[in-house]
């Protein structure tokens, strides 16, 4: 008989009366009046093994096993006695009567029980191998595998070719920091780990491969958040001779296919499309969570002439904004709730949180409860009530500051209230999946510190055809042929139509204050390639980690990556990064300089 004939979790009634050989880990061992029960676990689940003292040698071995011992069991599949069936297990109607038990490897006492749901992330990542044995982690990584498989199936059917691009490449710092790799044979020179395969996939389009994809690692040396890692995985795609709409349609179908085949979710037949400007105006975010039924009301123009300086000053400032957020039935929020929200928005730079409770709208000013009503004229109050559509029992929150502060703070408040218990109880948030495309992004953003425009996405994104003239006259007006796929408030994919003409790419570099010499030094290989009849092309990259995180309902992408880094970009399992031997540094022609200590 083979060492293993079946997986534990797949032993069901179809094997009744058969002898099986199972291998796995002791999940639990229970001694019930001389009979030992072992819950044996492998990647497919659990099966109950019964060890009877009639077989002395086997029973002696069973007495010695403990949690996480790796064992082999041979025995007879039989039905469980009446009253002992476990409907929660696939194997819950049967058990295996053990004939032979072999300890393949003993285990020291584990630092935690695998079913302990209150472990710190530090403990889990330090003992990641054990953590990965937990059923939820097994589920997450198998889900990740299925998502990757379905992406490959779809792309293969659509004529895409899987082509690997280099991991050691040229540093072109335009955005996040590169991870640098010193070259031993080229002293003083460095490779960079790719932030994306962007330029190589464009070169593949010039090289006539027409449709490319790869599921690949990317690297960015940036501060980490719950949805970021220094190394992450993209489903990276590029195609020639398709316009923006055709590209969006192609990859919208791919995401629908992946969700249907992996978690049996039917996404919308057509994803709504929203311009960036509309998303910012209505939700304060370029990745709006459409499950939350709250929207901003624009008040900037209506607050220009009020005496209340908190509103009028930003309303008359070039980059200022005044916006309101009406919360239906929010009148029941307590002062403690409001104070909590006030402290919350301070995280995003807001100086405070103005509010008005609408008790009886028909009474005008007298029907309102608020510390700011006394500072507003009747006409201003009427404008607020009219524009927000406030009803009796509502509360209106206000943000007035620089547009970025207003968008960030009121946008975060919108999500916090919507997803709160109050929001759920009052129908302010829907369940399910709400995808959309956000399009028509600004081509450039102005960097005050550098006193120049920087690329909002990357400098290889094509401007909209009607905005080409702005590249040289007014770059700030230029919109890009860029598009992001957003799902439940997460950007799961982003892409664009690329620049395929060398003269347009050179104009973009000039708008970014990248001179001809610098452009040639950093991107000469791309500019040269574009001169050889480069086709119109575009593409998209999806964050595999993010997609799987959402599907799994996980709190962090670290829960869907086998061996992730912490928020300090460290691996607690291997203790990477770590010091290296002085000899290695000498071979690389590198001398370390100790970081300067902050002055007391």
From Swiss-Prot:
The keyword Methyltransferase is annotated on this UniProt entry: no
Catalyzed chemical reaction(s): tRNA(Asx) + L-aspartate + ATP = L-aspartyl-tRNA(Asx) + AMP + diphosphate
UniProt GO MF annotations: aspartate-tRNA ligase activity; aspartate-tRNA(Asn) ligase activity; ATP binding; nucleic acid binding
Residues the UniProt record annotates as site (Important for tRNA non-discrimination): 32, 83
Binding site for ATP: 220-222, 229, 491, 543-546
Chief location bin: cytoplasm
GO biological process per UniProt: aspartyl-tRNA aminoacylation
Record-listed L-aspartate binding positions: 174, 220, 457, 498
Record's GO cellular component terms: cytoplasm
Annotated segments matching region Aspartate: 198-201
InterPro entries per the UniProt record, alphabetical: Aa-tRNA-synt_II, aa-tRNA-synth_II, aa-tRNA-synth_II/BPL/LPL, Asp-tRNA-ligase_1, Asp-tRNA-ligase_1_N, Asp/Asn-tRNA-synth_IIb, AspRS_core, GAD-like_sf
Protein's UniProt keywords contain Signal: no
Keywords: Aminoacyl-tRNA synthetase, ATP-binding, Cytoplasm, Ligase, Nucleotide-binding, Protein biosynthesis
Enzyme Commission number(s) of this protein: 6.1.1.23
PANTHER family: ASPARTATE--TRNA LIGASE, MITOCHONDRIAL (PTHR22594:SF5), ASPARTYL/LYSYL-TRNA SYNTHETASE (PTHR22594)
Known partners and oligomeric status: Homodimer.
Task of the protein: Aspartyl-tRNA synthetase with relaxed tRNA specificity since it is able to aspartylate not only its cognate tRNA(Asp) but also tRNA(Asn). Reaction proceeds in two steps: L-aspartate is first activated by ATP to form Asp-AMP and then transferred to the acceptor end of tRNA(Asp/Asn).
HAMAP family to which the protein is assigned, alphabetical: Asp_tRNA_synth_type1 (MF_00044)
Similarity field: Belongs to the class-II aminoacyl-tRNA synthetase family. Type 1 subfamily.
Protein's recorded name: Aspartate--tRNA(Asp/Asn) ligase
Natural source organism: Burkholderia pseudomallei (strain 668)
Taxonomy of the source species: Bacteria, Pseudomonadati, Pseudomonadota, Betaproteobacteria, Burkholderiales
Gene coding for it: aspS
């Amino acid at each position: 008989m083979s060492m293993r004939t079946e997986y534990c979790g797949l032993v069901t009634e179809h094997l009744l009366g058969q002898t099986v050989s199972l291998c796995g880990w002791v999940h639990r061992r229970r001694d019930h009046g001389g009979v030992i029960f072992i819950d044996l676990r492998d990647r497919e689940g659990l099966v109950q093994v019964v060890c009877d003292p009639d077989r002395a040698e086997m029973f002696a071995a069973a007495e010695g096993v403990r949690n996480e011992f790796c064992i082999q069991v041979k025995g007879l599949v039989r039905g469980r006695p009446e009253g002992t069936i476990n409907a929660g297990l696939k194997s819950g109607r049967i058990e295996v009567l053990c004939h032979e038990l072999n300890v393949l490897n003993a285990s020291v006492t584990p630092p935690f029980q695998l079913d302990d749901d209150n472990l710190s992330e530090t403990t889990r990542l330090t003992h990641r191998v054990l953590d990965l044995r937990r059923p939820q982690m097994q589920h997450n990584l198998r889900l990740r595998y299925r998502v990757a498989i379905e992406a490959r199936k779809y792309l293969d059917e659509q004529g895409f070719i899987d082509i690997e691009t280099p991991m050691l490449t040229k540093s072109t710092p335009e955005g996040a920091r590169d991870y640098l790799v010193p070259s031993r044979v080229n002293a003083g020179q460095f490779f960079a780990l790719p932030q994306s395969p962007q330029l190589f996939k464009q070169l593949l389009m010039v090289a006539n491969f027409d449709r490319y994809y790869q599921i690949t690692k990317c690297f960015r040396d940036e501060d980490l958040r719950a949805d970021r890692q220094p190394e992450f995985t993209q489903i990276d795609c590029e195609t020639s001779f398709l316009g923006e709409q055709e590209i969006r349609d192609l990859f919208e179908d791919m995401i629908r296919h992946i969700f249907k085949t992996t978690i049996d979710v039917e996404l919308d037949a057509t994803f709504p499309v929203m311009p960036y400007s509309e998303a910012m105006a209505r939700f304060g975010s370029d990745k709006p969570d459409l499950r939350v039924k709250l929207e901003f009301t624009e008040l900037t123009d209506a607050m220009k002439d009020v005496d209340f300086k908190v509103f009028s000053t930003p309303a008359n400032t070039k980059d200022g904004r005044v916006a309101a957020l009406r919360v239906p039935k929010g009148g029941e929020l307590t002062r403690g709730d409001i104070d909590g929200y006030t402290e919350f928005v301070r995280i995003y730079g807001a100086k405070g949180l103005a509010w008005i409770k609408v008790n009886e709208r028909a009474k005008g000013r007298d029907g309102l409860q608020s510390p700011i009503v006394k500072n507003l004229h009747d006409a201003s109050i009427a404008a607020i009530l009219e524009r927000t559509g406030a009803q009796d029992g509502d509360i209106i929150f206000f943000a007035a500051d620089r547009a970025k502060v207003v968008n960030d703070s009121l946008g975060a408040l919108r999500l916090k209230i919507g997803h709160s218990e109050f929001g759920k109880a009052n129908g302010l948030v829907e369940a399910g999946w709400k995808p959309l495309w956000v399009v028509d992004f600004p081509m450039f953003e102005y960097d005050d510190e550098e006193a120049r425009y920087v690329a909002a996405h990357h400098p290889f994104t094509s401007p909209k055809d009607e905005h080409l003239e702005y590249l040289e006259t007014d770059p700030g007006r230029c919109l890009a042929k860029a598009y992001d796929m957003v799902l439940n408030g997460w950007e799961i994919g982003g892409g664009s139509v690329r620049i395929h003409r060398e003269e347009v790419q050179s104009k973009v570099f000039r708008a970014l204050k990248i001179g001809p010499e610098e452009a040639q030094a950093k991107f000469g290989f791309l500019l040269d390639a574009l001169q050889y009849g480069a086709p119109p092309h575009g593409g998209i990259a999806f964050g595999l980690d993010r997609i799987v995180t959402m599907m799994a309902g996980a709190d962090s992408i670290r829960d869907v990556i086998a061996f992730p880094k912490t928020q300090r970009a460290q691996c607690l399992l291997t203790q990477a990064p770590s010091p290296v031997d002085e000899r290695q540094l000498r071979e690389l022609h590198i001398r370390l300089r100790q970081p300067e200590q902050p002055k007391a």
